[in-house]
Every structure is written in C-alpha cells, then in structure tokens.
C-alpha cells in the first residue's frame, strides 16, 4: 500500500483512512438506525461517527491532489451521486418515508471547485472557469426559489445550498487542498 505524501494522520495510507472512516460511519449509523428509538443513550456512537466525514473529505482532497485525470475522478463522483440518489428514491418509496443519506455532493462540489480554481490559477480560460464556478451557485439559488429541493431534479443537479454538512464543509475541503503544511490543515480542521 502506497503511503500518501505529507499525510497529517500518522502516515496512514489513503485506504486505511477510508477504512477508519467506514468503521466510524458504521458505528454512527448503528446508533442512528438501531438505538435511536430506544431508551439506550449511547451518544458516543454519534460522536465517533463524526470522525468519518473529515476523513472522507481528506481522502477526496488527496485524490484530487495526486490524480492524473481530475475530470475523470469528478465524473466518477457524479456517477456515484446519481446511483445513491436512485437508491434513496427507491428506499423512500418502499419504506414510505423520506430517506436522505447522500453526502457525495459535498465531495463532488469540493472536487469541482478545486479543479476550477486550479484552472484559474494556471490561467487557462479564466473567464470560462469563473462562469463555471457560478453555475452551481445560480442553480442552487434557482432550485431554492422554485422549490425543487428533494425532487428528481436534484438527482442530476445537486443543490450546493442543501448539502448535508453545509457549504462551510466545502470551504474546509478547498482550504485543506491549498494548505500544504500539516499545521495549517490541523488549524483549519479545528476552526471549521
């Protein structure tokens, strides 16, 4: 397993970070779906689960940093988003309740904005990339005005303003990407 260069997490591989995130997320969901309606108070499960999101975000940032084909990676994230949205729709229909567990838009938007900012920094088609940065914001505003939140439209055009962890999570990811030093990444994690 190849170690990620300059990793702030004790020189763990990206795969190990994902496995740790998966275990933490599973513990969180175990509480959410098994113990939530009982008198058992094991909120430590929820606390452990909060570790997963920053770990997955860090894995996405590392993928964007070291990927040879960033567009392909972004497109894969988009395909995963669509698949999970379809699964949500099917489960909501079968269980007769609204189910929402798709956190991939946070990572998708983070990857998109990292790519666009990189293109602007490289001075490649600056105006085009600035316009492309505005499109998710304008689509999100339009979606909020029209009231399409939770509709099939969001399967193909996720709303940047209704992502589960808020746009600040996206800003944290972009900040992490451009902060090369370990100390700066840790400070950003603490304050966001």
Role assignments for model-derived ranges:
Residues 1-192:
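Alpha-helical transmembrane segments and their immediate juxtamembrane cytosolic regions
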